[in-house]
Regions:
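Iron-sulfur cluster-binding electron-transfer modules in prokaryotic oxidoreductases
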Residues: 1-215
């Protein structure tokens, strides 16, 4: 996803840079799992890097684009607790804007395959970003077959709060519940806007022996 986004930004003539080897985890998994000490170390390291990268730039020129809603929330909100603020953009927001500005021109084609979209918790309910991903899909000629629980009523994939690395002791994993909803739409593809969700939904499809492709 990150490589594809970079290629699209280049095509649109966007002036951007990547942190490369200086990029490290935002600390989201550590904080959500209760390891505040590790989170503080990682957040301070990132804040120092951002301060160096954006040195001398006015506030309106400090923008960070991420492909992960967890990073979006952690950098945009959690880091603000340390007095650090940046303008955050999820890649679907930026790409959607570039299309509206005609800096990117998709070649829409009517797909015969049915597709459904999963709203990530940290993109949707936490940050109220619902339409940009859907508008992007529509601009590509894709019709979204919504699951019963969508947008502000969307159901978690099961990865939040550090649960991605934990095994269930009782009951069924949340991702299997969500995957059942996606399969029930008759969709052949599931689009997601979060790497955590992609892992959980993909694992769920494997567990269900489903041929539905996760994008």
């Amino acid at each position: 996803t990150t490589k594809a986004v970079a290629e699209l930004l280049h095509m649109a003539g966007v002036n951007f840079a990547v942190l490369g080897k200086r990029e490290t985890c935002t600390g989201d998994p550590a904080r959500r799992s209760g390891n505040e000490f590790l989170y503080q170390i990682l957040s301070r390291e990132n804040i120092e890097t951002f301060n160096e990268v954006f040195a001398g730039r006015p506030k309106g020129k400090k923008k960070v684009v991420v492909t992960c809603p967890h990073c979006f929330t952690t950098i945009g909100r959690d880091y603000a607790q340390s007095g650090f603020e940046l303008e955050m953009l999820h890649h679907t927001q930026l790409l959607n804007t570039l299309i509206k500005e005609k800096r990117l021109k998709p070649s829409p084609h009517k797909s015969e395959q049915k597709l459904t979209y999963h709203d990530p918790c940290y993109l949707g309910r936490h940050n109220q970003i619902y339409e940009p991903p859907r508008e992007l899909l529509e601009s590509a000629g894709v019709e979204v077959n919504e699951m019963p629980r969508n947008k502000e009523r969307s159901f978690c994939c099961g990865a939040g709060g550090g649960r991605m690395w934990m095994e269930e002791k009782i009951g069924e994993r949340i991702n299997l519940n969500r995957v059942d909803e996606a399969i029930a739409t008759g969709a052949e593809e599931v689009a997601v806007g979060c790497p955590f969700c992609r892992v959980m939904v993909s694992d769920g499809m494997v567990a269900k022996n489903s041929s539905v492709e996760v994008l």
